[in-house]
Every structure is written in C-alpha cells, then in structure tokens.
C-alpha cells in the first residue's frame, strides 16, 4: 500500500517536472506581432532614425518625393541619377546619399550568389556571410501594391527578385521583427550587389517591390524555423536529466514492488 502511494507521488512529480521544464524553455518572444504596438518593423517605431523601407514623404504606394510611376529626377523604370549600384545623388548603393548607406560600401563578391545558392543546401551556413544560413527556395508571394502599374510591374519582373532569403537561427533574436528586419537587409543587399556586378541595375520601383517581396519571404522563413525550433526543443525536454532520472526511479520502484 505504501509503495503504491510512493509510486503515485513519483508519477505526479515526474509529470509536474516535465511540464515545468517545457513551459520554462526559452523561446523567441513574439514582440507584439506585426503592426501591433511596441518596436515594429518597418522603421522600428523610431521617428527620425533609420527607417526601413525608405520613407521619403510617403509609405508604400504613396508619393515619395513625387508619385510612384511619375518623374522623380528621372521616370520610374529608368536610372535615378544613376542606377542602383551606381552613383545615386552623390553616392552609390551603400555609399551614402540614400537610406541604405548604413550597410557600408560593399566590395565585389568573389563568388556569384547563384553559385553559392546552388552549392549550399537549404539551411546550411553560407561561408563569408557571418553565420547566415540560406533558406529553402520559395514561390514568390502574390502581393498587391495598391496600384495597377506596380502590380503589373511585379508580375512582369518577379524573376529578377530573390526566391531564397538569408537568415540566422531564431534563437539569436528576441522577436520576429528583429529577425525579419535583419533577413530583409542582408538578402536585398546580397542580391543587389550580385546583380549590379553583372551589369544589371535596379530602379526605385525594383527596390520598393523587392523589399516587400523579401519581407514576406522572411516572415515565412521565420515561421518555418520557429516551428522546427519548438519541435527540437520538445524532443530535448523529454530526454533532459530530471525527467529521465524520475522515470528511471519510478520504473525501479514499480519493478521492486
């Protein structure tokens, strides 16, 4: 009778310990979600600071020092004081003169991005990118930009934009916003530098559309990685020392009894 009670209490203790470890396991914080207060992406809610995407008098689909699809020191679809990756108002991509200057002046890559993508398996760390991994290839998302011109432009030029994103493990970020912001920056930068070194330039419209497309892909990548991260964590909890010791003790007691 006494052994039966002891076995019952050990079983309760085992379940309680396993549950407590499961709830206490560290996981990335949601950060309030998209556009729901707190530090948000784009812009991280910091007026006057570096905002992403570039804010030049209007947000997505609004005037940007001149309406989208209208002249802005050069019509959309044409170089804007020099194409992307070339002099642009006194500075090229990453050379100042634009909101992307914080990335620093890029050096010419020694390896074509497509070659890197072909050689690296999805989820593998890409050499030379500081621990970033290359995600799986995705179908480019269906996005409406608020006007017929940009919707049509995206349909006709979507092949020019990335179908894979660069990211770091989810446990290195405090919330989804930070991972997505970093993912967009590195992916757009790598794709732009690689493309411009081949003699192709991106217009303002290209950059606006590409940032939106990559952002959506980074969100999808985050969701996939978070799910996999939680599943790995659940498996690790089951075989962590406290539950295993309690389970062995319970089995020994039942066998002896």
Swiss-Prot record:
Sequence repeats lie at residues 54-62, 63-70, 71-78, 79-86, 87-95. Residues 25-234 are annotated as: Interaction with GRB2, ERI3 and SYN1. It holds the Pfam family Prion_bPrPp. It is found in: Cell membrane; Golgi apparatus. Cu(2+) 3 binds at residues 80-82. Cu(2+) 2 binds at residues 72-74. Residues 54-95 are annotated as: 5 X 8 AA tandem repeats of P-H-G-G-G-W-G-Q. InterPro entries: Prion, Prion/Doppel_b-ribbon_dom_sf, Prion/Doppel_prot_b-ribbon_dom, Prion_copper_b_octapeptide, Prion_N. It is linked to Found in high quantity in the brain of humans and animals infected with degenerative neurological diseases such as kuru, Creutzfeldt-Jakob disease (CJD), Gerstmann-Straussler syndrome (GSS), scrapie, bovine spongiform encephalopathy (BSE), transmissible mink encephalopathy (TME), etc. This is Major prion protein. The lineage of its organism: Eukaryota, Metazoa, Chordata, Craniata, Vertebrata.
């Amino acid at each position: 009778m006494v052994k039966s009670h002891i076995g019952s209490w050990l079983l309760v203790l085992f379940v309680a310990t396993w549950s407590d470890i499961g709830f206490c396991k560290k996981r990335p914080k949601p950060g309030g979600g998209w556009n729901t207060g707190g530090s948000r992406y784009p812009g991280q809610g910091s007026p006057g600071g570096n905002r992403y995407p570039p804010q030049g008098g209007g947000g997505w689909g609004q005037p940007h020092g001149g309406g989208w699809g209208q002249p802005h020191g050069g019509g959309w679809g044409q170089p804007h004081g020099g194409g992307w990756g070339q002099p642009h108002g006194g500075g090229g991509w990453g050379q100042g003169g634009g909101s992307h200057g914080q990335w620093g002046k890029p050096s010419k890559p020694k390896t074509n991005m497509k070659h890197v993508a072909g050689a690296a398996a999805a989820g593998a760390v890409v050499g030379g990118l500081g621990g970033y991994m290359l995600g799986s290839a995705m179908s480019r998302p269906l996005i409406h930009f608020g006007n017929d011109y940009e919707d049509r432009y995206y349909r006709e030029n979507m092949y020019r934009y990335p179908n894979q994103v660069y990211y770091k493990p989810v446990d290195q970020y405090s919330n989804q916003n930070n991972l997505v912001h970093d993912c967009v920056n590195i992916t757009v930068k790598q794709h732009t530098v690689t493309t411009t070194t081949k003699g192709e330039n991106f217009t303002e419209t290209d950059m606006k559309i590409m940032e939106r497309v990559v952002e959506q892909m980074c969100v999808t990548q985050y969701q996939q990685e978070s799910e996999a991260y939680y599943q790995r964590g659940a498996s690790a909890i089951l075989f962590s020392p406290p539950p295993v010791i309690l389970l062995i003790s319970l089995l020994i007691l039942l066998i002896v009894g």
